[in-house]
Swiss-Prot record:
<feature type="short sequence motif" description="Proline-knot">
    <location>
        <begin position="124"/>
        <end position="133"/>
    </location>
</feature>
<comment type="subunit">
    <text>Homodimer.</text>
</comment>
<dbReference type="GO" id="GO:0004497">
    <property type="term" value="F:monooxygenase activity"/>
</dbReference>
<keyword id="KW-0492">Microsome</keyword>
<feature type="binding site">
    <location>
        <position position="83"/>
    </location>
    <ligand>
        <name>Ca(2+)</name>
    </ligand>
</feature>
<feature type="binding site">
    <location>
        <position position="92"/>
    </location>
    <ligand>
        <name>Ca(2+)</name>
    </ligand>
</feature>
<dbReference type="GO" id="GO:1990137">
    <property type="term" value="F:plant seed peroxygenase activity"/>
</dbReference>
<protein>
    <recommendedName>
        <fullName>Peroxygenase 1</fullName>
        <ecNumber>1.11.2.3</ecNumber>
    </recommendedName>
</protein>
<feature type="binding site" description="axial binding residue">
    <location>
        <position position="76"/>
    </location>
    <ligand>
        <name>heme</name>
    </ligand>
</feature>
<dbReference type="GO" id="GO:0016020">
    <property type="term" value="C:membrane"/>
</dbReference>
<keyword id="KW-0551">Lipid droplet</keyword>
<keyword id="KW-0256">Endoplasmic reticulum</keyword>
<comment type="function">
    <text>Calcium-binding peroxygenase involved in cutin monomers biosynthesis. Can catalyze epoxidation of fatty acid and sulfoxidation reactions that can proceede competitively, although in favor of the sulfoxidation. Can only use unsaturated fatty acids with double bonds in the cis configuration as substrates. The preferred substrate is oleic acid and is inactive toward ricinoleic acid. Free fatty acid and fatty acid methyl esters are effective substrate forms, but not phospholipids and acyl-CoA. Hydroperoxy-trienoic (HPOT) acids are preferred over Hydroperoxy-dienoic (HPODT) acids as oxygen donors.</text>
</comment>
<keyword id="KW-0479">Metal-binding</keyword>
<keyword id="KW-0349">Heme</keyword>
<dbReference type="GO" id="GO:0005509">
    <property type="term" value="F:calcium ion binding"/>
</dbReference>
<dbReference type="Pfam" id="PF05042">
    <property type="entry name" value="Caleosin"/>
</dbReference>
Amino acid sequence: MAEDAVVSDAVVVSDAMSSVAKGAPVTAQRPVRDDLEKHIPKPYLARALVAVDVNNPEGTKGGRHEHGQKSVLQQHVSFFDQNGDGIIYPWETFRGLRRLGFNLIVSFIVAIGIHTGLSYPTLPTWRPSLLFPVYIDRIHKAKHGSDTATFDTEGRFMPVNFENIFSKNARSQPDKLTLREIWMMTNDHRLAYDPFGWVANKGEWILLYMLAKDDEGYLPKEAIRGVYDGSLFEFLAEQRTKKAHGKQH
């Protein structure tokens, strides 16, 4: 009887820790990592200031990127605040996109789309503004659905959800995504009755792929992490500036 109890307890413990249910094949098709605590202290803890992963447990180091006591989501958009006043206007987003290398047409369409969709939720008043500003201190109000949940509802960074992007979707390379994998991932993230989230999520990932894919057509993990805290934008803009200056000389 005692042996039966031990076996029974072992089964219960095993089931309690299982991330796969045989009756739900999708749980096996999209596995989650169970080893994160070997690499990241408390990977389930939302990080307010830094975007951490197994390769960067302290977040972005070196370079010019500083968190400045802004949430990771605020850092994500601050690159586009050209004058540093805490408010992003459509023309600032347009200029930021141009600095990143997008052409005039794409920059115009994306800037209009972003501010049309995200401005109103961030306004400090119920009255809309025809200038369509985005207030950085309220950017968490503009978080849309059907996403990876790497940002929580307050704009903090969730390491466990970031790592699960790759455990669930990276089939060709463990730390990179193909365009097809991105397309399938954004399909899998779609929530019911959330057309805005469907379009926004897919559009953001396709733009990121266009911006940061490598020579082999993969989107690297480090580039994805960098876009979450905005350090990728700063790096790419700086590289383009150096390249332009090099051509002049």
